[in-house]
Amino acid sequence: MSLGKLTVNGRQDGFLCEGKPFFWFADTCWSAFTSIPEADWDYYLTRRAEQGMNVLQINTLPQWDRCCPDLGIWPYASEDGVHFDWSRPNQAYWDRAAAMCRAAVEHGIRPALVLMWCNYVPGT
């Protein structure tokens, strides 16, 4: 399923989807990949689609201020879930994230991925 290509409009103050105005109606589901069990993901997506959401903003890495228990799956090798060995990606995590993104698209919702939160950048 394709949701169409997003572009910036001519005034550079909004988005177009396949040439038509696109309103970015998003939910911030920052910790989806680390904190939402697969059994709950379909329910969540169904509910957000019913509410008219068309975008989910998700961190690809664990949210720095997460307060909910994590599922214990990390994007990179880690002993504590805070410090990562960036040279050792966890393929199971990334496969799960990709499957969750595909499920969102199947519900008509675009994943908008935040690649790196500032706490992972030294000196920020």
How should each PLM-predicted stretch be described?
Residues 3-124:
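Active-site mouth of glycoside hydrolases
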